[in-house]
UniProtKB/Swiss-Prot annotation:
Known EC number: 2.7.4.22
Family annotation (InterPro entries): AceGlu_kinase-like_sf, Asp/Glu/Uridylate_kinase, Uridylate_kinase, Uridylate_kinase_bac
Family: Belongs to the UMP kinase family.
Gene (UniProt): pyrH
The name this protein goes by in its record: Uridylate kinase
Length: 251
């Protein structure tokens, strides 16, 4: 691409904050990620971030063990608040202007999400970290990312994952899985490709927000700018070419 998007929504899983400790939040991992975020901000790009909470808690796990879905999801949403605060403090240590806006009211630790205020912050160059998911149970943080991207009129949604794009099968389980360079929203939905849930994909399609799926390792290599200049580093989801396949995994 010849120019950078004006405004980006970056979706991070809670797992990006684990580092090498297997659970929770590792400060070094936070600092490495925030260096990539700082790099993007220095390009003049307005940046919003939605972060998951799976490194701390997954509501769906408690539901499987008998807890009602609603309180289980509330606990998962609160986990994203912890991650957001950790990310905010790491950004502050790099002197990056940032704020945490929560879909759940926790006024002593985060601002309540307000659409107009979020837009104002973005225009002022503040990195806005959106936590609390959508504020409602039964919705994933991927859906929250698509919702916030739609609300702030993001030009691109970046999703960091464990693999370097979208494959026709799980590449962590099948070494013959084939990667797509580019694929349409409709094909992702039709083939039920497990990159984001269907609600999130449909929201992005309805609001014409391209999705770029890339390997979270780029965040730790300070190479997020490469992702924005060369789409071969992942998979682009939009209404363009129907997915053509890239090379098989070299393993």
């Amino acid at each position: 691409m010849s120019t950078f998007p004006k405004r980006i929504l970056l979706k991070l899983s809670g797992e990006t904050l684990i580092g090498n400790q297997g659970f929770g939040i590792q400060q070094q991992a936070c600092l490495q990620i925030t260096k990539s975020i700082q790099q993007i901000q220095q390009l003049g790009i307005q940046l919003g971030i939605v972060i998951g909470g799976g490194n701390i808690f997954r509501g769906i796990n408690l539901k499987a063990n008998g807890m009602p879905r609603v309180p289980a999801d509330h606990m998962g949403m609160l986990a994203t608040l912890l991650n957001g605060i950790a990310l905010q403090q790491a950004l502050i240590s790099l002197e990056v202007k940032t704020c945490v806006m929560s879909a759940l009211d926790c006024p002593k630790v985060a601002e309540s999400y307000q659409w107009s205020k979020a837009l104002q912050y973005l225009e002022e160059g503040v990195v806005v970290i959106f936590v609390g998911g959508t504020g409602n149970p039964y919705f994933t943080t991927d859906t929250a990312a698509a919702l916030r991207a739609s609300e702030i009129q993001a030009n691109l949604l970046l999703k960091a994952t464990k693999v370097d794009g979208i494959y026709n099968q799980d590449p962590l389980k099948n070494t013959q899985a084939v990667k797509y360079d580019r694929i349409s929203y409709s094909q992702v939905l039709a083939e039920k490709l497990q990159v984001m849930d269907a609600t999130a994909i449909a929201l992005c399609r309805n609001h014409q927000i391209p999705i770029f799926v890339f390997n979270m390792k780029r965040l730790f290599e300070n190479r997020l700018d490469h992702v924005l200049t060369d789409y071969s580093h992942g998979t682009l989801v939009d209404d363009g070419e129907i997915g053509h396949e890239a090379n098989k995994l070299d393993r």
